[in-house]
Protein backbone atom coordinates (compact mmCIF):
# COMPACT_ATOMS: atom_id res chain seq x y z
CA UNK A 1 0.00 0.00 0.00
CA UNK A 2 1.32 3.47 -0.96
CA UNK A 3 2.80 5.42 1.94
CA UNK A 4 1.56 8.98 1.29
CA UNK A 5 3.55 10.44 4.19
CA UNK A 6 6.75 8.92 2.83
CA UNK A 7 6.04 10.26 -0.67
CA UNK A 8 5.39 13.76 0.69
CA UNK A 9 8.65 13.63 2.65
CA UNK A 10 10.55 12.57 -0.49
CA UNK A 11 8.95 15.40 -2.50
CA UNK A 12 9.97 17.92 0.17
CA UNK A 13 13.53 16.52 0.24
CA UNK A 14 13.72 16.90 -3.56
CA UNK A 15 13.29 20.65 -3.16
CA UNK A 16 16.54 20.73 -1.15
CA UNK A 17 18.62 18.91 -3.80
CA UNK A 18 21.90 20.46 -4.92
CA UNK A 19 22.20 19.72 -8.63
CA UNK A 20 23.87 22.70 -10.36
CA UNK A 21 25.35 20.52 -13.12
CA UNK A 22 22.58 18.15 -14.20
CA UNK A 23 19.63 20.20 -12.87
CA UNK A 24 18.11 16.77 -12.06
CA UNK A 25 16.58 17.02 -8.58
CA UNK A 26 15.87 13.82 -6.66
CA UNK A 27 14.39 13.32 -3.20
CA UNK A 28 14.14 10.24 -1.05
CA UNK A 29 12.61 9.30 2.27
CA UNK A 30 13.07 6.13 4.29
CA UNK A 31 10.84 4.92 7.10
CA UNK A 32 12.68 3.20 9.94
CA UNK A 33 11.12 0.34 11.85
CA UNK A 34 10.84 2.84 14.73
CA UNK A 35 8.37 4.80 12.56
CA UNK A 36 10.66 7.79 12.13
CA UNK A 37 11.18 9.15 8.60
CA UNK A 38 14.61 10.26 7.36
CA UNK A 39 15.11 12.17 4.14
CA UNK A 40 17.84 12.80 1.64
CA UNK A 41 18.39 14.59 -1.65
CA UNK A 42 20.98 14.23 -4.36
CA UNK A 43 24.07 16.36 -3.83
CA UNK A 44 26.25 16.87 -6.88
CA UNK A 45 29.91 17.77 -7.05
CA UNK A 46 32.06 19.18 -9.84
CA UNK A 47 34.01 15.94 -9.52
CA UNK A 48 31.03 13.84 -10.64
CA UNK A 49 32.15 10.65 -8.89
CA UNK A 50 31.71 12.40 -5.54
CA UNK A 51 27.99 12.99 -6.14
CA UNK A 52 25.72 11.32 -3.57
CA UNK A 53 22.30 10.03 -4.63
CA UNK A 54 19.17 10.88 -2.66
CA UNK A 55 18.47 7.26 -1.70
CA UNK A 56 21.90 6.73 -0.14
CA UNK A 57 21.75 10.15 1.50
CA UNK A 58 18.44 9.24 3.20
CA UNK A 59 19.66 5.83 4.32
CA UNK A 60 22.97 7.21 5.59
CA UNK A 61 21.13 9.94 7.55
CA UNK A 62 19.04 7.22 9.20
CA UNK A 63 22.00 4.96 9.93
CA UNK A 64 23.93 7.94 11.33
CA UNK A 65 21.02 8.51 13.73
CA UNK A 66 21.28 4.91 14.94
CA UNK A 67 18.61 3.23 12.81
CA UNK A 68 19.36 -0.19 11.31
CA UNK A 69 15.96 -1.61 10.28
CA UNK A 70 13.65 -0.10 7.68
CA UNK A 71 10.15 -0.75 6.37
CA UNK A 72 10.09 1.30 3.16
CA UNK A 73 11.97 3.79 1.02
CA UNK A 74 10.46 6.24 -1.47
CA UNK A 75 12.35 8.08 -4.21
CA UNK A 76 10.95 10.74 -6.53
CA UNK A 77 12.30 12.58 -9.55
CA UNK A 78 11.12 14.45 -12.64
CA UNK A 79 11.13 11.49 -15.03
CA UNK A 80 8.72 10.17 -17.66
CA UNK A 81 8.20 6.91 -15.77
CA UNK A 82 8.64 6.55 -11.99
CA UNK A 83 12.34 7.11 -11.26
CA UNK A 84 14.61 4.08 -11.06
CA UNK A 85 17.44 3.83 -8.50
CA UNK A 86 21.00 3.35 -9.73
CA UNK A 87 22.86 0.12 -9.04
CA UNK A 88 24.86 1.58 -6.14
CA UNK A 89 21.67 2.69 -4.38
CA UNK A 90 20.08 -0.72 -4.95
CA UNK A 91 23.09 -2.38 -3.35
CA UNK A 92 22.91 -0.06 -0.31
CA UNK A 93 19.18 -0.84 0.00
CA UNK A 94 20.15 -4.52 -0.05
CA UNK A 95 22.71 -3.97 2.71
CA UNK A 96 19.93 -2.70 4.97
CA UNK A 97 17.28 -5.08 3.60
CA UNK A 98 14.72 -2.38 2.72
CA UNK A 99 11.66 -4.55 1.92
CA UNK A 100 9.46 -2.04 0.06
CA UNK A 101 10.74 0.48 -2.48
CA UNK A 102 8.33 3.12 -3.80
CA UNK A 103 9.30 4.86 -7.04
CA UNK A 104 7.51 7.99 -8.21
CA UNK A 105 7.65 10.89 -10.62
CA UNK A 106 6.22 14.40 -10.46
CA UNK A 107 3.22 13.46 -12.62
CA UNK A 108 1.84 11.28 -9.83
CA UNK A 109 2.89 7.92 -11.27
CA UNK A 110 3.88 5.54 -8.47
CA UNK A 111 5.17 1.97 -8.55
CA UNK A 112 6.09 -0.28 -5.64
CA UNK A 113 8.70 -3.01 -5.77
CA UNK A 114 10.30 -5.46 -3.42
CA UNK A 115 14.05 -5.35 -3.01
CA UNK A 116 14.29 -8.72 -4.75
CA UNK A 117 12.49 -7.31 -7.81
CA UNK A 118 14.95 -4.43 -8.12
CA UNK A 119 18.10 -6.36 -7.23
CA UNK A 120 17.56 -10.10 -7.60
CA UNK A 121 21.23 -11.06 -7.23
CA UNK A 122 22.73 -8.44 -4.94
CA UNK A 123 26.26 -8.82 -3.62
CA UNK A 124 26.57 -10.35 -0.14
CA UNK A 125 29.43 -11.49 2.08
For the regions a language model picked out, list residue spans one by one:
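Polybasic, low-complexity association/targeting segments
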Residues: 1, 38-39
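C-terminal binding/interaction regions
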Residues: 2-19, 67-125
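Short glycine/threonine-rich catalytic loop with a Thr-x-Gly-x-Asp
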Residues: 18, 47-51
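Short beta-strand scaffold segments in enzyme catalytic cores
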Residues: 23-32
Amino acid sequence: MMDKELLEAALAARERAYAPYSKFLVGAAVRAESGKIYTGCNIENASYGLTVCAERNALFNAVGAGERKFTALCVVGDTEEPISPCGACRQVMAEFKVPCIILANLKGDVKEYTLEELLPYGFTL
